[in-house]
Protein backbone atom coordinates (compact mmCIF):
# COMPACT_ATOMS: atom_id res chain seq x y z
CA UNK A 1 0.00 0.00 0.00
CA UNK A 2 1.61 3.23 -1.09
CA UNK A 3 0.83 6.48 0.69
CA UNK A 4 1.10 9.85 -1.03
CA UNK A 5 2.06 12.79 1.17
CA UNK A 6 2.28 15.31 -1.66
CA UNK A 7 2.96 14.42 -5.27
CA UNK A 8 2.06 17.15 -7.75
CA UNK A 9 2.10 16.68 -11.48
CA UNK A 10 -0.03 16.37 -14.57
CA UNK A 11 0.42 12.60 -14.83
CA UNK A 12 -0.78 11.99 -11.28
CA UNK A 13 -3.91 14.07 -11.89
CA UNK A 14 -4.60 12.41 -15.24
CA UNK A 15 -4.21 8.94 -13.74
CA UNK A 16 -6.54 9.87 -10.88
CA UNK A 17 -9.24 11.24 -13.17
CA UNK A 18 -8.94 8.33 -15.58
CA UNK A 19 -9.34 5.88 -12.70
CA UNK A 20 -12.68 7.50 -11.89
CA UNK A 21 -13.84 7.34 -15.50
CA UNK A 22 -12.92 3.65 -15.51
CA UNK A 23 -15.12 3.04 -12.44
CA UNK A 24 -18.04 5.42 -12.99
CA UNK A 25 -20.20 5.11 -16.12
CA UNK A 26 -21.70 8.53 -15.36
CA UNK A 27 -18.32 10.23 -15.70
CA UNK A 28 -18.21 11.83 -19.16
CA UNK A 29 -14.99 13.81 -19.15
CA UNK A 30 -12.07 14.79 -16.96
CA UNK A 31 -13.18 18.41 -17.02
CA UNK A 32 -16.61 17.48 -15.68
CA UNK A 33 -14.95 15.54 -12.86
CA UNK A 34 -12.86 18.54 -11.84
CA UNK A 35 -15.78 20.96 -11.97
CA UNK A 36 -18.67 18.89 -10.62
CA UNK A 37 -17.47 15.90 -8.55
CA UNK A 38 -17.21 16.71 -4.81
CA UNK A 39 -15.01 13.66 -4.23
CA UNK A 40 -12.41 15.02 -6.64
CA UNK A 41 -12.40 18.41 -4.91
CA UNK A 42 -12.14 16.77 -1.49
CA UNK A 43 -9.05 14.79 -2.50
CA UNK A 44 -7.45 17.89 -4.02
CA UNK A 45 -7.90 19.86 -0.81
CA UNK A 46 -6.80 16.90 1.31
CA UNK A 47 -3.49 16.66 -0.54
CA UNK A 48 -2.82 20.29 0.36
CA UNK A 49 -4.03 19.94 3.95
CA UNK A 50 -1.98 16.76 4.42
CA UNK A 51 1.13 18.54 3.15
CA UNK A 52 0.72 21.24 5.78
CA UNK A 53 -0.09 18.67 8.47
CA UNK A 54 3.11 16.76 7.74
CA UNK A 55 5.00 20.06 7.96
CA UNK A 56 3.41 20.64 11.41
CA UNK A 57 1.37 23.64 10.26
CA UNK A 58 -1.66 22.09 11.92
CA UNK A 59 -3.91 25.14 12.08
CA UNK A 60 -3.49 25.84 8.36
CA UNK A 61 -4.17 22.18 7.64
CA UNK A 62 -7.38 22.21 9.68
CA UNK A 63 -8.60 25.44 8.06
CA UNK A 64 -8.12 23.91 4.60
CA UNK A 65 -9.86 20.73 5.74
CA UNK A 66 -12.82 22.66 7.13
CA UNK A 67 -13.16 24.70 3.95
CA UNK A 68 -13.21 21.46 1.97
CA UNK A 69 -15.89 20.05 4.26
CA UNK A 70 -18.02 23.16 3.76
CA UNK A 71 -17.59 22.98 -0.01
CA UNK A 72 -18.03 19.23 -0.54
CA UNK A 73 -19.84 17.74 2.46
CA UNK A 74 -16.89 15.36 2.89
CA UNK A 75 -14.81 15.40 6.08
CA UNK A 76 -11.23 14.12 5.82
CA UNK A 77 -8.84 14.72 8.69
CA UNK A 78 -5.60 16.33 7.44
CA UNK A 79 -3.49 13.56 9.02
CA UNK A 80 -5.30 10.72 7.24
CA UNK A 81 -2.99 8.86 4.86
CA UNK A 82 -4.57 8.30 1.44
CA UNK A 83 -3.01 6.41 -1.45
CA UNK A 84 -3.50 6.81 -5.18
CA UNK A 85 -6.83 7.07 -6.95
CA UNK A 86 -9.29 7.15 -4.05
CA UNK A 87 -12.74 7.63 -5.61
CA UNK A 88 -15.34 9.07 -3.24
CA UNK A 89 -18.54 8.66 -5.25
CA UNK A 90 -21.37 11.13 -4.48
CA UNK A 91 -19.50 11.89 -1.28
CA UNK A 92 -22.02 13.61 0.97
CA UNK A 93 -21.58 12.59 4.59
CA UNK A 94 -18.28 10.72 4.21
CA UNK A 95 -16.04 10.94 7.29
CA UNK A 96 -12.39 9.77 7.29
CA UNK A 97 -10.72 9.92 10.69
CA UNK A 98 -7.30 11.15 11.74
CA UNK A 99 -5.37 7.86 11.84
CA UNK A 100 -7.05 6.26 8.83
CA UNK A 101 -4.81 4.65 6.22
CA UNK A 102 -6.25 4.10 2.74
CA UNK A 103 -4.47 2.21 -0.03
CA UNK A 104 -4.61 2.56 -3.80
CA UNK A 105 -7.69 2.39 -6.05
CA UNK A 106 -10.20 2.34 -3.22
CA UNK A 107 -13.85 3.28 -3.87
CA UNK A 108 -16.00 4.81 -1.14
CA UNK A 109 -19.68 5.71 -1.53
CA UNK A 110 -21.68 8.37 0.31
CA UNK A 111 -22.37 8.38 4.07
CA UNK A 112 -19.41 6.10 4.84
CA UNK A 113 -17.56 6.55 8.14
CA UNK A 114 -13.99 5.43 8.76
CA UNK A 115 -14.13 6.20 12.45
CA UNK A 116 -12.87 5.38 15.90
CA UNK A 117 -14.64 3.53 18.67
CA UNK A 118 -16.37 5.58 21.39
CA UNK A 119 -13.74 7.68 23.15
CA UNK A 120 -13.00 7.37 26.84
CA UNK A 121 -13.64 10.24 29.24
CA UNK A 122 -9.94 11.09 29.17
CA UNK A 123 -8.91 11.65 25.55
CA UNK A 124 -5.22 11.96 26.44
CA UNK A 125 -4.77 8.19 26.46
CA UNK A 126 -5.90 8.08 22.82
CA UNK A 127 -3.45 10.59 21.45
CA UNK A 128 -0.72 9.35 19.12
CA UNK A 129 -2.26 5.88 18.85
CA UNK A 130 -3.95 4.13 15.95
CA UNK A 131 -7.70 4.64 16.36
CA UNK A 132 -9.07 4.38 12.82
CA UNK A 133 -9.19 1.73 10.07
CA UNK A 134 -6.61 0.62 7.55
CA UNK A 135 -8.19 0.08 4.13
CA UNK A 136 -5.96 -1.87 1.75
CA UNK A 137 -5.84 -1.62 -2.06
CA UNK A 138 -8.85 -2.13 -4.35
CA UNK A 139 -11.46 -2.15 -1.56
CA UNK A 140 -15.07 -1.03 -2.24
CA UNK A 141 -17.11 0.38 0.65
CA UNK A 142 -20.85 0.71 0.00
CA UNK A 143 -23.08 3.61 1.01
CA UNK A 144 -23.74 4.09 4.70
CA UNK A 145 -21.16 1.55 5.85
CA UNK A 146 -19.34 2.12 9.13
CA UNK A 147 -15.78 0.83 9.56
CA UNK A 148 -14.84 1.46 13.17
CA UNK A 149 -11.65 1.17 15.18
CA UNK A 150 -8.10 0.15 14.24
CA UNK A 151 -9.24 -2.74 12.04
CA UNK A 152 -7.77 -3.78 8.69
CA UNK A 153 -9.91 -4.35 5.60
CA UNK A 154 -7.97 -6.66 3.29
CA UNK A 155 -7.22 -6.17 -0.39
CA UNK A 156 -10.14 -6.38 -2.82
CA UNK A 157 -12.70 -6.77 -0.03
CA UNK A 158 -16.20 -5.39 -0.53
CA UNK A 159 -18.28 -3.84 2.24
CA UNK A 160 -22.04 -3.80 1.63
CA UNK A 161 -24.35 -0.84 2.15
CA UNK A 162 -24.96 0.04 5.81
CA UNK A 163 -22.69 -2.73 7.07
CA UNK A 164 -20.91 -2.19 10.39
CA UNK A 165 -17.32 -3.43 10.56
CA UNK A 166 -15.59 -3.72 13.95
CA UNK A 167 -13.21 -6.63 13.20
CA UNK A 168 -10.54 -7.31 10.60
CA UNK A 169 -11.82 -8.26 7.14
CA UNK A 170 -9.99 -10.89 5.04
CA UNK A 171 -8.84 -10.20 1.50
CA UNK A 172 -11.56 -10.55 -1.16
CA UNK A 173 -14.30 -10.97 1.45
CA UNK A 174 -17.80 -9.59 0.95
CA UNK A 175 -19.20 -8.23 4.21
CA UNK A 176 -22.89 -7.45 4.78
CA UNK A 177 -25.14 -6.79 7.74
CA UNK A 178 -25.02 -5.45 11.30
CA UNK A 179 -22.68 -6.66 12.62
CA UNK A 180 -21.13 -7.47 9.25
CA UNK A 181 -20.59 -11.09 8.26
CA UNK A 182 -18.55 -12.56 5.43
CA UNK A 183 -21.06 -14.00 2.97
CA UNK A 184 -18.34 -15.49 0.77
CA UNK A 185 -19.40 -13.93 -2.52
CA UNK A 186 -16.13 -12.38 -3.62
CA UNK A 187 -16.56 -13.44 -7.25
CA UNK A 188 -20.27 -12.72 -7.63
CA UNK A 189 -22.32 -9.57 -8.24
CA UNK A 190 -21.96 -6.83 -5.65
CA UNK A 191 -24.28 -3.87 -5.16
CA UNK A 192 -22.77 -1.03 -3.14
CA UNK A 193 -26.18 0.64 -2.76
CA UNK A 194 -28.15 -2.32 -1.39
CA UNK A 195 -28.22 -5.93 -0.31
CA UNK A 196 -25.79 -8.21 -2.09
CA UNK A 197 -27.64 -10.99 -3.98
CA UNK A 198 -28.05 -14.30 -2.13
CA UNK A 199 -26.71 -12.92 1.14
CA UNK A 200 -29.97 -13.73 2.95
CA UNK A 201 -30.05 -17.18 1.37
CA UNK A 202 -26.56 -17.97 2.58
CA UNK A 203 -27.36 -16.66 6.06
CA UNK A 204 -30.43 -18.89 6.31
CA UNK A 205 -28.41 -21.93 5.26
CA UNK A 206 -25.79 -21.46 7.97
Predicted regions and their residues:
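Short, glycine/charged-enriched secondary-structure capping and boundary segments
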Residues: 122-123, 156, 174, 188-191
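Regulatory activation segment
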Residues: 123-131
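Left-handed beta-helix
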Residues: 72, 77-78, 83-84, 89-98, ...
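Terminal amphipathic alpha-helical/low-complexity segments used for targeting or macromolecular assembly
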Residues: 1-72, 187-206
Amino acid sequence: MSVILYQPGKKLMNDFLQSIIDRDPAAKSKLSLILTYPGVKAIFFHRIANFFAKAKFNLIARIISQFSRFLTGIEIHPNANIGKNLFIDHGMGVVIGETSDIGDNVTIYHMVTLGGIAPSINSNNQRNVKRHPTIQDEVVIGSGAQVLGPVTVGRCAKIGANAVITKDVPEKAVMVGIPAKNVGLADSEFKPYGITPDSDTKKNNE
